[in-house]
Amino acid sequence: MNMDFVFDEERFRITDSIDQTYNYKKIGDFQTEVLIPRNSPIRLQKNIIAAIKAYYLGYKSIDSVYKKYSDYWFIDSDSLEEININTYMNVLDYVKNNVNTFLDLLQNLDCNEKLGLIVSRAALYRLQSTFKSILLLMSRNQYLESMNLCRVILEQCSWAFCVYAKEHEEDIFSINPLNCLKDFKTFYTPAGRLYGFLSNRVHISPELTPEYLQIINNEIIVTFNPISYRYDCYYSILSVTDMYCSTIEYIFRDFINKFDFVNKYEKEFVLFKEREFVTQANIFLDDIRNSINNEIHR
């Protein structure tokens, strides 16, 4: 079988616009939103919200609105410390650089003679839109939603791994991505632990209740994205980026010459223990630990 592979590159390519959007944040309500610098003081942000509310309520002053409701606002606010923005930007650059490098690799491969390779290539290539969605969600502090999509990437990589060597349509499309993890772990050994981590975070379990439930002025407040999830999200996106690149190198090992994520050990290709992710992730995680300490002592 020989088939031309066409890529709709411009529609999904990750761009620098994500860098720009992270320098700003939207605040407001269901009627009005405004865009402000991300490092704006909390008091200023609350004053803007109070002004919006007062306007629609017909009040001449924001004072009564601020006094009555401001305790409810930004209870789950993202930290405005510079280290958090820098950490995010470092994670963003790492993900973008690696994902775009491997998108180029997929686009230029010449391996269209086996059906399994064709569908694996397509499945992995289309994940670029999933990566972009994750980064955009992270820029809006939607950490749980970001980790949900990280799990989608894990499942899709697992499926691509299980079908790339297949030659017949019925063998490929009868495989459920949810049933591929066991085989995938034979290559990407951290997959099981990562899947468990993501599942525990994205499902609201009873033991997690204190993380998203707060009581203020004797009223119960639900927070949708506790700030602690940010660090879990960084870990998740770094991990699935490593998984994505490693999976591509392994599946298409017969068609590429340079390897950064896998290496040949005896007669088999295995994860390269000294790959960039291992060292870079430790650097990012150190930054994250510093951020956590700053949060605790703020």
Question: Regions from the language model: what does each represent?
Answer:
Residues 1-119, 123, 130, 137, ...:
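A cross-kingdom marker of C-terminal helix-rich interaction/assembly modules
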Residues 146, 166-175:
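Short, glycine/acidic-rich hinge or "gate" loops at secondary-structure transitions
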Residues 164, 168, 209-212:
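Short, flexible/disordered secondary-structure transition segments
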